[in-house]
Swiss-Prot record:
NCBIfam families: L6_bact. One of its GO terms (cellular component) is cytosolic large ribosomal subunit. Belongs to the universal ribosomal protein uL6 family. Keywords: Ribonucleoprotein, Ribosomal protein, RNA-binding, rRNA-binding. Coiled coil: none annotated. Part of the 50S ribosomal subunit. InterPro entries: Ribosomal_uL6-like (IPR000702), Ribosomal_uL6-like_a/b-dom_sf (IPR036789), Ribosomal_uL6_a/b-dom (IPR020040), Ribosomal_uL6_bac-type (IPR019906), Ribosomal_uL6_CS (IPR002358). This protein binds to the 23S rRNA, and is important in its secondary structure. It is located near the subunit interface in the base of the L7/L12 stalk, and near the tRNA binding site of the peptidyltransferase center. This is Large ribosomal subunit protein uL6. GO terms for biological process: cytoplasmic translation. Gene3D superfamilies: Ribosomal protein L6, alpha-beta domain (3.90.930.12). One of its GO terms (molecular function) is rRNA binding. Pfam families: Ribosomal_L6 (PF00347).
């Protein structure tokens, strides 16, 4: 039995939800998201409470049950409070600047890296810290992973782009021969 799937999702007053067949529509004052569900899951929306039930007893139906419960919960949290990820840029000469709809990164390459900011994502840059905010959890995580992939942290000095809560396992350098 899915513990995530059987959870009832409370929809706050700032978010409106509606069910149209197998499609769930969520919106707040600024944005709207929709979630297309599989026919193996039954959706129930009553008194601002959203719940899912598997249609069959097979493993596939139970898997969809938990998946759609988690996806719907992420949309509700995203529209009510939002998601954010913080990246830190460490290294001599590594700089970050916010341009016009682009993030300009100097990461020790022969050229600056220009990352176009996708729609629905907001970025704040303070010194060498990048904060990525948005209502779509998947998109916020994807943008953070793409920016980190330009220069992942290396294990010797820790230079590169890392998540703020990421712990880099450091390696010892070479020792001199005697």
């Amino acid at each position: 039995m899915s513990r995530i799937g059987k959870r009832i999702i409370e929809i706050p007053s700032s978010v409106q939800a509606s069910v149209e067949g197998s499609k769930l529509l969520f919106k707040n004052s600024k944005e709207k998201h929709e979630l297309e569900t599989h026919n193996r899951v039954k959706i129930t929306l009553e008194n601002n409470q959203l719940s899912f039930q598997p249609v069959g007893e097979d493993a596939q139906s139970r898997a969809y049950w938990g998946t759609y419960g988690a996806l719907a919960n992420n949309i509700v949290i995203g529209l009510s409070t939002g998601f954010s990820k913080t990246l830190e840029v460490n290294g001599v000469g590594y700089k970050v600047a916010l341009g016009n709809k682009t993030l300009d990164l100097s990461l020790g390459f022969s050229h600056p890296v220009k990352y176009p900011i996708p729609a629905g994502i907001e970025m704040v840059v303070e010194k060498n810290t990048i904060t990525i905010k948005g209502s779509d959890k998947q998109k916020v995580g994807q943008v953070a992973a793409e920016i980190r992939s330009f220069r992942p942290p290396e294990p010797y000095k820790g230079k590169g782009v890392k998540y703020s809560n990421e712990v880099i396992i450091r390696k010892a350098g070479k020792t001199a021969k005697k």
